[in-house]
A protein has these predicted regions:
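Charge-biased low-complexity segments
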Residues: 1-206
């Protein structure tokens, strides 16, 4: 069977079983390795979850194993492998990233708005002040600031990778810091995670 076709069918089945059987996203592992044998009848047997691959460690939760086992058992039988005209068992190994599940990866939001970055840009546009002296001196361009949204919704500044003037950098960074605590953080598999943003702010005299 085509590996890509199988993966799509399997992901669809996993999603269906998750919804049907009431699995919660926070119970599941983000990434895991699955190994199974397709026997001569086309059934998936001897399902295993190796704990490493090329130095990468895996620690799948019990609920993740249960979900994948159920989904695998409900797939249509495979076409068995053949060698010299005879059916033979075939071992398949798959690295599974659960990002395809609903709610597996939820981007940060600002002040409860669905489009967090758009709401953040609107906030900046309302509060930006273009210093008159800099404007008259022809200082313009893009201030690009990097910052983290922490798991608790606070802000940690990294710095500015681009800026036409330190005063503009300071102004933008202050506005960003003022939003600390007003963010809902990135959620991966239901768990709050640190998230890096590189955000451009344009100062245009025209």
């Amino acid at each position: 069977d085509d590996p890509d076709v199988f993966r799509k069918q399997f992901e669809k089945k996993v999603t269906k079983v998750m919804k049907r059987d009431g699995y919660r996203i926070e119970e599941l592992s983000h990434e895991l390795l699955m190994k199974f044998t397709i026997d001569t009848l086309g059934r998936c047997v001897d399902v295993q979850y190796p704990d490493s691959l090329g130095g990468v460690r895996f620690n799948p939760t019990q609920r993740s194993r249960e979900l994948l086992n159920t989904a695998l058992s409900e797939l249509n039988p495979f076409t068995p492998a053949y060698k010299d005209g005879r059916k033979i068992p075939y071992v398949r190994k798959m690295l599974i990233n659960m990002n395809f599940l609903p709610g597996a990866f939820v981007k940060p939001t600002f002040r409860g708005k669905k489009d967090g970055l758009m709401a953040f840009r609107e906030y900046l546009n309302r509060n930006l002040v273009y210093d008159t002296k800099l404007y008259e001196a022809g200082v313009y361009g893009t201030v690009r600031v990097e910052f983290y949204i922490e798991p608790d919704g606070t802000i940690t500044l990294v710095g500015a990778s681009e800026s036409p003037h330190p005063a503009l950098t300071e102004h933008v960074q202050k506005l960003i810091l003022d939003t600390s605590g007003q963010w809902t953080p990135l959620l991966e598999m239901g768990h709050p995670c640190r998230y890096l943003i590189s955000f451009p702010v344009n100062f245009d005299p025209g």
